[in-house]
Every structure is written in C-alpha cells, then in structure tokens.
Amino acid sequence: MPDRRLSQLLKSKLLRRSSTTATTSPKQNQKPVNAQKKAAVGADPLVDPNSTSDLSCSLPPHLLTSNEGEGDAKSRAYSIISSIPLDHPSSPDEIPGPATGSSAGCEQYFTHFDRSGANSRQEGSQNGSIQQSPTFTRTLRHKQLTEEKDKGKLQSREGDQRGEYGYQRIRNDSNDSDPQYSLTTELANKPSTPQTPAGDDSLHSPSATPLPLSPSLPGPTGASSLQAAYRPVRENSSVPLVESQLTPSLGAVAEDSSGESAFHFVGPSSSSPFPKRPPLGFRRQSLLPASHQHLISGLLGFGPSQNLGQGSGHPSTVNADMIPRKVWVKRPGGSATLVPTMEDSLVDELRDQVIMKYANSLGRTFDSPDIMIRISPREGSNRQSTPERILSPEEPLGVVLDTYFPGGQTVDEALVIDIPQRRTPKPSPRHPVYYHHSEPGEHGEYFPLMPANPNAPTPPTHPSASSTSVNAHHTGPSISILTTDSNMASCPQPPVAAPQVPTPPGPPPESPQTKTHTPPARVASPRPRPTKPKKAGNGQSPNAAFGGLIEGTVPPINVLIVEDNIINQKLLEAFMKRLSVRWKCAANGEEAVRKWREGGFHLVLMDIQLPVMNGLDATKEIRRLERLNGIGVFTKTASGRSSASSLSPEVNQASSEVSLSEEDTLHDLSLFKSPVIIVALTASSLQSDRHEALAAGCNDFLTKPVGFPWLEQKVTEWGCMQALIDFEGWRKWRGFADEPQSSSPTDGGFTSPLQAGANGVSSRTSTSPSSAAVNATARAFATGPGAGKRKSTVPELTKPVDILPEEPPGSGSGEGNETLDSPASPLTSVHVGDPTEPPGDEEQQALDAT
C-alpha cells in the first residue's frame, strides 16, 4: 500500500513538473529538517517525505475539469483548500513524521492565484494527473535541486507572481465583499476572518494544527502556516506587525515564503494597472445622506427659484418675507430715491435706511427717530380709506404700501420725509462766528489792561483828519488827563463856535484848535493843535518823505529792538523799514542797557528770554537808571523840584558825582526827554507772565508772533505819545523850526506867530474863552499875593519858571520832565510865565521854547 501510494505520488509529481511550469518559493535558505524527515526520504530522494496517506487521496477528476464555470471553479478550489485537513489517515506507517510547512503549500496557493498559469494547470489535471495538495512540502534537498534547474524561470516568473499577488491582496483589503475578486481572494478572506470562531477553529483543528511540537518539529503544515501568515496581514496592514506575529508563533517557519510574500508584494501596488479605490476622506462629499441634500441646496441658495430644479419635492427654505424690497422716498421738493427694505420691515426700520441714504443732509443733524414718514394716496383713490397721514413707527411697511398702492409704488408716489421745523443747534454755531468776526483782534487783548480803554477806538479815527488824528493820539496814551480833555473837548465845541472872543485881548488862532481840546487849566494840549493848520499847508513835503505812512502820523521815533533770535530780529527790522522808523538792534539785555544809555530812544521792543541778562532784568535796570537820574516823574528834592529838571547841567553833574556813581550817571540828560516806553515781547501768553512783565516796568505786554498791521498801530500809538512829550523834536520834524515868528504883543490880546503860515502874515485872529481864561489865570498867579504859598500848594507850576531860562536852545523841550502824575503838555509851563514880563513877551518866549 505505501509503495503504491509513493509511486502514484512520484508519478503525479513528475507529470505535474512536465506539464506545468514549476514555481518555487523565493526563499533561498531553509532550516535543516530533523532526522525523521531524512529517514523518510529513503532511497528515493525525489519523493516528498512530508506527504501523508491522507493527503494523497485522489481527487475526483471533475473537480479539475476545464469546462467548469468560473464560479464553480472558485467554489470548488476553495473547498479543496478548506478540506485539506487530514481526515483519513490510513495507518501510522504511512505518516513518516509531522508535516512541516514548506514552499509547496505556498506554491499551490499561488497556482490557484496565478490566472496566467491556470489553463496549463487545468490541462495537466485533465491528463490524469492528481493535483498536489497544498499541505505537501519539499525537503531541503529537493528544493535545492529544483532551484538549480529552474533558476532562470524562477527569476522571470517570480516578479509576475508577486505583483499579481500584491494587487489581489490590496483589492481584497479594500473591499472584502466584492464578488468580482478571484478565487485566491476568497481563499485569503475566509480562513483569516477574525470575527468568526470558525476561522479560529480551522487554525486549531487536528488536521491543520501540527502534533505537539518538539525540537525536531519546525512548524505547522502548509495550510495552517498560510493562514497564520496572512491573518496578521489582514488584521494589521503594517509590515512590522506581520513579522512580529510570525516570529513567535511559527518559530522556525517565521521565514516562510507565505509571510515573506506578503511582506514583499504589498509595496509595488503603485505600479499596478488596477486602480486603487480612493480613501474614505475623498469619497465622502457631504455630511448628510443623499435623501437630505435638498437642505444643503436650500441653505446655499438665495431664493426659492434655485431649488425648483432639483426635483426633490421639498419646499423652499427661504421665506417669502425675507425677499428684499425697495421703496421710493423723497424730501419735500426733492427728487425721489430708492431705499432698500425687507418685505416684513416696519416704518421705523425704513427711517433707519433713510438716515443712511441721506447721510450728509439728515444724518449729520438728525437721528432716525426725529424724522417722520408721510404717505399720500394715489390720485383717483378713495381718500377716506387711504387718507394722507404720517406713518406710525410700528406699522408694517409692506402692508401699508400694498394698501395705498395696489400693483406697486411709482416714482411719483414716493413717501415724503418730514423733519422738525426748528432746530436750536443750527443758529447757535453762527453767533460765535459772527461775534468772532466782530472782535477787534489783537487790540482787545492789550487795551483792557490800560485805564484809558475807552479811548482805544479813537486810534482808528486818526486818519480821518490830521488835526483829530494827533488829538486822538494825545488822548489815547495820556490816560487820566487826556481822558478828561477828550470829554471836555466834545462839550466846549459849541461854545467855541460862538464868536464871543472880543472880550479876551488877543487870542492866538490856536484857539480854534483848542476848541476841540478846551481844558480850562491845561491849555497845553490845545497849543499843539494850532500847528495843524500849518501842517495842512506845508506838511505835504514831510509826508512825502514818509511815503508808506498814513498821512505822516507816525513821528520820527527811534526804536531799540532787543531780540536774540536773528530771524525775528530781521523781521522787526523789515517792519521798521516799512514804517520809515529809525532803529537799532541788541542781542541781549546787557547790550540793550548799554545802547539805551547812549540816549535818543523812544520805544524799546524787549524780548523776555535773552542771554546774559533777560528782558525783565534789563527793564528793571533801565527803570533804576531813570529814577536815579531824575528822568520822568520821580520824587522831588528838598526845594520841591524834580531831581532831574531842577538842576542846571553844571549843578546836575556836580550832584551826580556826590550822590551817583559813575556807572549810574547818564552824561547827556538832554537826550532823555521822558522814560522810555518798553514793550515786552514773549511767546508766552500766561497771565502770570503778563503781570510779571508789567511789574518789572514794562508799559505793554505783547505775544509773538508779531504781525505788521499790529506793529504799525502800536508804533503809531506809542510814537505819538513820545511826540507829545518831545514836542520840540516833533515840531522840528514837521518843519516849524524855521518859520518866521511875528509877534505884536498888545495888552488886549496875542497874535499867534503860528498863524502867519507860509506868507508870514497873520491870516486870521481869533479869540476864545479858553485862551482868555488861561491868560487870566497866568496873570493871577503872576501878580496875586501869596507867591510863596502858591509854590507850596501848586509846586508843578513853579518848576517851569526856573527851567525855561536854563534850557539850552535846540535841546528840545523838557516839558515832559516836569509832569508830576502824568505827562503834561510842554506848553503848560508857558502860561506860568515870569510875572515880571508882560504877557506878550511871555507868550512869545513860550513859543520860542517850543
């Protein structure tokens, strides 16, 4: 029996080898078999020692016929492999030893898998050969012989088999239930399914599981090794896990060709002609099933029209009330415009849209609740059902429009936007602008600090008439005295117009001008006025010399500019040039004091922040020197005279050597007619800085930057004040110094030498009560008793009597030095003449002095 079976097996082996292409395992190394296997080989080394009697059972020929259908072939091939377990062992002698896994099982597995070689194998089976069971294995010797013979064929066929196997394995993993897969896919799926206990039982069945392992037993049979090798591949498609599963469970069979085939053949799937199914992330296109796709379309659509073509039959997800609607609106008398709203919007929401539409005209002034929407019915409609009215904010706009305008609203039927009639914010901004324009400008900042603030408007009236301009300049700076003069000047004008002059003896023609200034005891201010008529006759040439001035009102004053900034210094110099005014510059306070000591300055523009010595210190030093040298209104000596004016030049110098140091002495007092006017210039506008500057001795406080119009007015104002003080210098400048003086003094009156004019003949004689009063007052002081008492009570009237004889000719009048509480006119001293002289000589002497 065993011999017969061995011969049949050998014959079938030889027939199979001749009819089919031998496929061998890619493994080159195989562990040596045990001694039982070598003994079982016996004399015939070509016989497979692992074959058993139960494995050599003949299979019915109809199982391997080529005319079977493909489905039957697959099922029967699967049944062949699944029925491989050893069910019919004939005798113990026929089992030489436990079956060991080899490449035969894997080879037969690939034989069923290989579609290209399926026909050749089926032909071999039809010729009467018995197909070898997958559980047969080869010995190491037989394997080496086969590898030596078929080495060339192995290399060519090995790649094809691996590629096809890898492709089938990948497709099998991607979809296990696909009926299109081949028989080998089913073979790999069934035994390796981990969910069914049958798969596990097949692995451990008596037929598939080897006998108890011994050191000589290398591993399980071919079928079980195949299942054990491919099961981890199905469960985990990672190569390291395949090796870790094979190594501990199979021992020596860990290098079995089945496991290695799975390891090598999964890789080259990229070059497979079979397309790989896309992953799950790419196949999933929606979160909802196909039956709910209409929801996605409804959400993404803008209207119900887009959902009509889907054919799903589901209603649209967009409500008809959400459709936008446009309404015609307009302002009274304006053009209509469209405003977007919703179908279910209220009138209040329409007002919000109107504010956004009229962002400039309405949005800047009104809020949406402030406006009202008025609707007018359509022409020809029932006025009772649809009257013209103001829409309420809570009314639905769509319903109202459909009620008033069935069929749609036209442009002519636009809603009217009504706004409140009176808005207080509108006029309020205009008033500040109006008042701002009416402000006098920079003059308002400085004149309020002066007591003569009411006289500030008089400077603009200067250009009106030359005589009044000088008078106005007189009144502006003269503060207390000139304020009364100006008030009295306006009152006496009507009496002056009346020719009641015959009573006074010979009033000079100055009296008409004194009519404008008729101070009873202060006729000094009227005296300059008589010179104005001559200025009208001869003053054209001096005015031509100062072409840029306003009728020559700015006198030839000398200005000292104290500024450390070269740019500001040049600007002020340019202003002085335009005004035709002489000037000098100083870069610091010390230099300013040094130049002031030279004399001849009428105005000082003093910057506060200066190097070496600041402006306030320089101002204090100038005021100190003026006080020590008796310039201006200062304390009197024991005799009641001014410290500066009561002494002759010789006596003055002698006393200065005793009381004053050389540094504090001013050598030529004739150049200092009055205290110089100091104007503080600073970039600070703080009130504290203003007070500090005024306390230091400044006459005015001005803020930078300085404009030319302001500077021109200021120079005119302060220059005219100095012209009144230095009347002699101003008179020379006006051309009166060379006039012939014809005086015919009589007891009854005086003929003014200034009235002679250019012809040298008195043009007119006029008398005024003011001049008569002045003369009477002078005579009363001259001849009346109590001359000593007069000196004590009215000390200011006695000083000019002593000064006039001592004043050197041509040095200018020192009248400004005799004022006690205000800069009095230099002519005040004229009326208090020498009592020994006749009145005519006194008047003439006064005129000569001026």
UniProtKB/Swiss-Prot annotation:
Record's compositionally biased regions (Pro residues): 492-511
Claim: Cytoplasm is one of the keywords in the record: yes
Matching PANTHER family: HYBRID SIGNAL TRANSDUCTION HISTIDINE KINASE J
Cellular compartment(s): Cytoplasm
Basic and acidic residues bias: start-end ranges: 144-163, 436-445
Positions with biased composition (Low complexity): 7-25, 762-782
Protein name: Response regulator sskA
Region: Disordered, residue numbers: 1-225, 419-542, 736-850
Ranges of Polar residues composition bias in the record: 117-138, 177-196, 477-490, 819-828
Residue ranges that the Swiss-Prot or TrEMBL entry lists as coiled coil: none
InterPro entries: CheY-like_superfamily, Sig_transdc_resp-reg_receiver
Sequence similarity: Belongs to the SSK1 family.
Pfam entry (one): Response_reg
SMART domains per record: REC (SM00448)
Family matches, as PROSITE patterns: RESPONSE_REGULATORY
Residues annotated with 4-aspartylphosphate modification: D607
Disruption phenotype: Leads to increased germination that induces more inflammation in host lungs. Decreased ability to induce the sakA-dependent stress pathway. Leads to sensitivity to oxidative stress and heat stress.
